[in-house]
């Protein structure tokens, strides 16, 4: 058991180091992240880029509170909002009421996957589940205990949110806490009329 915790901590440390390097590179080079470029391109062209030009969102599998696997590919054919978060993260906590509101409004049409960054020490399934229950949130939560989803998405800082269209294309990315207006803008990109 200790070995799994150590491996999870090492994976999380690697994610954080790589994330810091990516953020530093982005700031120094002035380049946008792929999701930001897609958002800017879509707005500049007045419409979505042809699907062939859009990156396909990486599939991942994480586990729900009962230990059942949940994969992004399970939702193909439906727009998806993927949010990487942790219960100890203040900015993550600040955006959750907006996610809950939109989940209650659009949960039948848009899939919401709240991916908890479970490292086994600072963040455990138990602590995250307790936070969700105490806060009264009902959106789906999955646990990324090996950081594979975070690594696949380059979610190097928390919170990070991806907006994925029904065909599985990564349309936009938001790093840091987002407000209701930004969440709505992302939803409009993947589900017009949201």
Where do the model's predicted regions map?
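Thiol-/selenol-based redox modules, centered on thioredoxin-like
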Residues: 163-194
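Conserved redox-active cysteine motifs that mediate thiol-disulfide chemistry
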Residues: 76, 84-101
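Conserved hydrophobic/aromatic "anchor" residues
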Residues: 60, 70, 75, 84-85, ...
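Conserved helix-turn-beta segment immediately C-terminal to the redox Cys motif
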Residues: 78-79, 96-116, 133, 180-181, ...
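N-terminal targeting signals for export/organelle localization
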Residues: 1-56, 194
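Thiol-based oxidoreductase modules, predominantly thioredoxin-like and allied folds used
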Residues: 110-124, 137-146
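Short, internal strand/loop/helix patches
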Residues: 129-167
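A short beta-strand-turn-helix
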Residues: 51-54, 59-80, 104
């Amino acid at each position: 058991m200790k070995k799994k915790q150590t491996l999870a901590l090492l994976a999380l440390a690697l994610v954080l180091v790589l994330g810091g390097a990516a953020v530093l590179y982005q700031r120094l080079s002035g380049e946008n992240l792929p999701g930001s470029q897609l958002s800017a391109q879509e707005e500049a062209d007045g419409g979505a880029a042809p699907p062939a030009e859009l990156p396909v969102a990486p599939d991942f599998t994480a586990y729900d509170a009962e230990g059942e696997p949940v994969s992004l590919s399970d939702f193909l054919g439906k727009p998806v909002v993927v949010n990487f978060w942790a219960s100890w993260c203040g900015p993550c906590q600040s955006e959750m009421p907006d996610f809950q509101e939109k989940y209650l409004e659009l949960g039948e049409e848009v899939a919401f996957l709240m991916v908890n960054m479970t490292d086994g020490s600072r963040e455990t399934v138990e602590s995250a589940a307790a936070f969700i229950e105490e806060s009264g949130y009902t959106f789906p939560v999955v646990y990324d205990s090996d950081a594979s989803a975070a690594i696949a998405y380059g979610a190097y800082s928390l919170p990070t949110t991806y907006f994925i269209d029904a065909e599985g294309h990564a349309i936009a990315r938001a790093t840091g806490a987002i407000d209701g207006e930004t969440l709505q803008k992302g939803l409009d990109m993947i589900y017009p009329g949201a």
